[in-house]
């Protein structure tokens, strides 16, 4: 026994607990916990029964309402003996009538909400092509497939056309025209501003141009010779074999081996200087080199944009074929004062 427990206050006023040992107190604690759990469970079960009673009554009322029309239809009685819903509702209390009326109103609302979802017509343009790819569908959906495929193809064509307009800055009056008529409308109504690159909206640079491969003297000689043969006729090999050998030797491509020797540029500024350049000399060399690049760029621009001569006689052409097509059609303009050529500061 513990002597210090005599002054301990017990809320339950059970003084016998002070005389119990530790094991006995633990057993009492276990029993008390078990009793508390059982009583709490009993209270919860009682509350559930109380809550389920109104629901059971309401369920009985609904079942009675459903069975009432069936019984009235089976018994072929007169119109005065048939019970309507209003007559049935008068047999119950006011609370029950309100609850049944609310349930009936909710059911009607559910039907009205679901009706638009069921009767909504599907959008034919948003249907996937994979829906028509099943062999189980047969030939019934053939017309739908054609309409859907035509819609998809037109949408792709319109997307490509819009991308081309954004790229070239084209604004057509008839946006519904297809891509073959796109360039015709541009030619009739619009001119491209070649003071800057219409594709990049920036100043021209040297890399926007490339040498024309059709301008080589050998190919030009071949074209002239073919034009001459078309008018006069080719000579026979037996009589003019020596002439044909000479022509074949002239038309060979050995001249392309040293093509860069014919177009050699001058030495860059400061190339022959033996000592290191000063700051002023370095800046002057940079300005001179930038001026050389500017002259080359302008020369290439003048050659590529000259539509008065045929394309095969232009020494330089644009690297983008779209620009060459615009030059051939003549739907562009530029001025020497507004021409922008990139110059590094």
Curated annotation (Swiss-Prot):
One of its GO terms (molecular function) is identical protein binding. Keywords: Cytoplasm, DNA damage, DNA repair, DNA-binding, Endonuclease, Hydrolase, Meiosis, Nuclease, Nucleus, Phosphoprotein. It is found in: Cytoplasm; Nucleus. The keyword Protein biosynthesis does not apply. It comes from the Eukaryota. Pfam families: SAE2. Changing residue 278 to A: Reduces DNA damage-induced phosphorylation. GO terms for biological process: DNA catabolic process; DNA double-strand break processing; DNA double-strand break processing involved in repair via synthesis-dependent strand annealing; gene conversion at mating-type locus; meiotic DNA double-strand break formation; meiotic DNA double-strand break processing; telomere maintenance; telomeric 3' overhang formation. GO terms for cellular component: cytoplasm; Mre11 complex; nucleoplasm; nucleus. Its EC number is 3.1.-.-. Residues 21-172 are annotated as: DNA-binding. Endonuclease that cooperates with the MRX complex in processing meiotic and mitotic double-strand breaks by allowing the endonucleolytic removal of SPO11 from the break sites and ensuring both resection and intrachromosomal association of the broken ends. Required for proper recovery from checkpoint-mediated cell cycle arrest after DNA damage. MRX complex and SAE2 remove a small oligonucleotide(s) from the DNA ends to form an early intermediate which is rapidly processed by EXO1 and/or SGS1 to generate extensive tracts of single-stranded DNA that serve as substrate for RAD51. This is DNA endonuclease SAE2. It comes from Saccharomyces cerevisiae (strain ATCC 204508 / S288c) (Baker's yeast).
């Amino acid at each position: 026994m513990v002597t210090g427990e005599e002054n301990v206050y017990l809320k339950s006023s059970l003084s016998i607990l002070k005389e119990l040992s530790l094991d006995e107190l633990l057993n009492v604690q276990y029993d008390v916990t078990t009793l508390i759990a059982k009583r709490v469970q009993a209270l919860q079960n009682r509350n559930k029964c109380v809550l389920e009673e109104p629901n059971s009554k309401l369920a009985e009322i609904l079942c009675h309402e459903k069975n009432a029309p069936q019984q009235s239809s089976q018994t072929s009685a007169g119109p005065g003996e048939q019970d309507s819903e209003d007559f049935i509702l008068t047999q119950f209390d006011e609370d029950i009538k309100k609850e049944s009326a609310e349930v009936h109103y909710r059911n009607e609302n559910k039907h009205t909400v679901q009706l638009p979802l069921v009767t909504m017509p599907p959008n034919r343009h948003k249907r996937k092509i994979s829906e028509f790819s099943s062999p189980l569908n047969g030939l019934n959906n053939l017309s739908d497939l054609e309409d859907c495929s035509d819609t998809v193809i037109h949408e792709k064509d319109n997307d490509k056309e819009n991308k081309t307009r954004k790229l070239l800055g084209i604004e057509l009056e008839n946006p519904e025209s297809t891509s073959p008529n796109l360039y015709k409308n541009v030619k009739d109504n619009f001119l491209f501003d070649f003071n800057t690159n219409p594709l990049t909206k920036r100043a021209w640079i040297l890399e926007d141009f490339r040498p024309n491969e059709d301008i080589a003297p050998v190919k030009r000689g071949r074209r002239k010779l073919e034009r001459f043969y078309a008018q006069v006729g080719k000579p026979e090999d037996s009589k003019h074999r020596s002439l044909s050998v000479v022509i074949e030797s002239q038309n060979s491509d050995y001249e392309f081996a040293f093509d860069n020797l014919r177009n050699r540029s001058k030495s860059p500024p400061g190339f022959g200087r033996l000592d290191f350049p000063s700051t002023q000399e370095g800046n002057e060399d940079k300005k001179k080199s930038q001026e050389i690049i500017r002259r080359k760029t302008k020369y290439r621009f003048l050659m590529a944009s000259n539509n008065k001569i045929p394309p095969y006689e232009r020494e330089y052409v644009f690297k983008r074929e779209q620009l060459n097509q615009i030059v051939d059609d003549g739907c562009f303009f530029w001025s020497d004062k507004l021409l922008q050529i990139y110059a590094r500061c």
